[in-house]
């Protein structure tokens, strides 16, 4: 028997109810995910996974594709019930017929069970075939009035472990404005107004990770005041980002070249935030000037 049970979520429900958004949400929560897995392959897949991966959280989308679907999935569920190494839940996504029709018309896609092309007929047949599975589901979510963002938040609230470090993490990075803004930054702060160590010959070839540069940057009164205000701004808003279901928050601090001031500020910020949150720090342009000089 495995020391740690596999936590399996089977994502199913009405076509057009949001299974694609759901599986992306599970991926953000640290689950290993697979979309559109035939029910008959689930047991074989789980046999391969047991003991071969460090990730004990799996989410599989299982879709209705034929009239034999329920019989197939029922056999799978019976097998899972007998497996002591797996804890599983079924997440069933539903929505009102009118909303499902509107979504299909918006995407101009055909319903997989609409043999004659009529969307509503396909929806009615699918609802009839899925009714027994819906009754077996531990989690039923009606997405009729939910935006994709709200669905992500709902899934995060129901399935994320608050102690799980995968649920929300912070990326703090430094950069140089002369090399362009980071495309993935959520929050950007500019420290170009602070005294620049570049103009001190003894500091020019060092970076904000070196003590001499760090002390030079931080020992100015305006630096300390700005840093305290920056930390005071960021810390209170982090729970809000987590509550909204955001998986990664990228905070970027920039100076002219990304070697001195921004590096010192970003690293200090990362170290302080890491006292209460999972944080990773990086310095995009820290060595760019050195590399340019060496090539010339």
Curated annotation (Swiss-Prot):
Entry-linked SUPFAM superfamilies: P-loop containing nucleoside triphosphate hydrolases
Compositional bias (Basic and acidic residues): 282-296
Renumbered residue ranges of the record's region Disordered: 277-296
Keywords assigned by UniProt, alphabetized: ATP-binding, GTP-binding, Nucleotide-binding
A GO MF term: GTP binding
Residues where ATP binds: 13-20
InterPro entries the record matches: P-loop_NTPase, RapZ-like, RapZ-like_N, RapZ_C
Segments forming a coiled coil: none
Residues holding GTP: 63-66
One Pfam family from the record: RapZ-like_N
Top-level taxon of origin: Bacteria
Role: Displays ATPase and GTPase activities.
Family: Belongs to the RapZ-like family.
HAMAP family reported for this sequence: RapZ_like (MF_00636)
Name of the protein described by the UniProt record: Nucleotide-binding protein SSA_0810
Species this chain originates from: Streptococcus sanguinis (strain SK36)
């Amino acid at each position: 028997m495995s020391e740690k049970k596999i936590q399996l979520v089977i994502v199913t429900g009405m076509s057009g109810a949001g299974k694609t958004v759901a599986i992306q949400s599970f991926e953000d929560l640290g689950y290993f995910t697979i979309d559109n897995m035939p029910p008959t392959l689930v047991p074989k897949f789980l046999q391969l996974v047991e003991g071969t991966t460090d990730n004990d959280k799996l989410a599989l989308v299982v879709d209705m594709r034929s009239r034999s679907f329920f019989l197939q999935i029922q056999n799978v569920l019976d097998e899972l019930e007998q497996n002591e190494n797996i804890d599983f839940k079924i997440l069933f996504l539903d929505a009102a017929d009118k909303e499902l029709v509107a979504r299909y018309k918006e995407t101009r896609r055909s319903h997989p069970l609409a043999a004659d092309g009529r969307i509503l007929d396909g929806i009615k047949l699918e609802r009839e075939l899925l009714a027994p599975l819906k009754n077996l589901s531990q989690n039923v979510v009606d997405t009729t009035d939910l935006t994709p963002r709200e669905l992500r938040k709902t899934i995060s609230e129901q399935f994320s472990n608050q102690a799980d470090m995968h649920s929300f993490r912070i990326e703090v990075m430094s950069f140089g404005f002369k090399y362009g803004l980071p495309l993935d930054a959520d929050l950007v702060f500019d420290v170009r107004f602070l005294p620049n160590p570049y103009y001190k010959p003894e500091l020019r070839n060092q970076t904000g990770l070196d003590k001499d540069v760090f002390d030079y940057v931080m020992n100015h009164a305006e630096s300390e005041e700005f840093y305290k205000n920056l930390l005071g701004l960021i810390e209170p808003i982090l729970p809000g980002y987590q509550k909204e279901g955001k998986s990664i928050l990228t905070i970027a601090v920039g100076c002219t070249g990304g070697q001195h001031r921004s590096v010192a500020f970003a690293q200090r910020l990362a170290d302080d935030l890491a006292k209460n949150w999972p944080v990773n720090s990086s310095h995009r342009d820290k060595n760019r000037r050195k590399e340019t000089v060496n090539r010339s």
